[in-house]
Amino acid sequence: SADTTIKIGAKSFSESKILGELYALALEDAGYKVEREFEVSDNLIHQAVCDGQIDMYPEYTGTSLLTILDQPMETDPQVTYDTVKEMYAEKFNLDVLDMCEASNGNGLSMRADVAEKYGIKSISDLQANADKIRFGGTSDTFEREDGLPGLEQTYGTFKFKSKNTFDNSLKYQAMANDEVDCVPAYTTDAQLSSDEFVLLDDDKHFWPPYNIIPVVRQELIDAHPDVAEI
């Protein structure tokens, strides 16, 4: 394995880079040389692994299913994984290794004081009280099927008091500064551990599961089957 260099990719947000680094360290421990490509944009990373510019990277089952494979929504984690694994092998010659129980799902986060004031615990509650709530998100939030347009198909129209667009990294700051009351969140966001913000219950199960999966080029697994075990 000493003469094999494995190129590990990651998307440009922190959780993806941390996962990529965990893969890299595990492979280095096993005696492989590793190159790290940790700033790949979301829309290029799949093509990069298909083209062999990288050998593996961490992905999420829900992203694979909806965005890459353009398949219909599925809420069962195992069905989602099985579909992705099968179709990746068939279409892209990519191997999807075992999924991780950790799931970085999509959700909506609110200022805790505002949620309490209006008795909002779930996304259905939010929809019923939307006219009192200032909502903010990225441009993707307002355009993508796994954003507001899709939410409205499941929950009905959200007649928000106002809608603001800003960069993803500023969303919790915008809530803390009292500019907005509700923003899209990842269920693993560190800010949700504070008392200031709450995650709303996706009571109609709109979002699919987002379990972490290592996506690997099949050629690499064929040449080095032990990589799958590491």
Model-based region annotation:
Residues 23-30, 123-161:
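Ligand-binding cleft/hinge of the Venus flytrap
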Residues 77-135, 218-221:
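A conserved helix-loop-strand patch within extracytoplasmic ligand-binding domains
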Residues 25-26, 43-54, 149-154, 168-183:
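Short helices/loops that flank or line small-molecule/ion binding pockets
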Residues 2-15, 23, 32-37, 131-137:
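Short, well-ordered beta-strand elements
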Residues 14, 35-47, 139, 161-173:
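Short helix-initiation/N-cap motifs at beta->coil->alpha
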Residues 68-97, 179, 191-205:
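Ligand-binding "clamshell"
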Residues 183, 189, 194-229:
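C-terminal lobe and pocket-closing loops
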Residues 38-42, 52-65, 80-81, 111, ...:
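Beta->alpha turn/N-cap motifs
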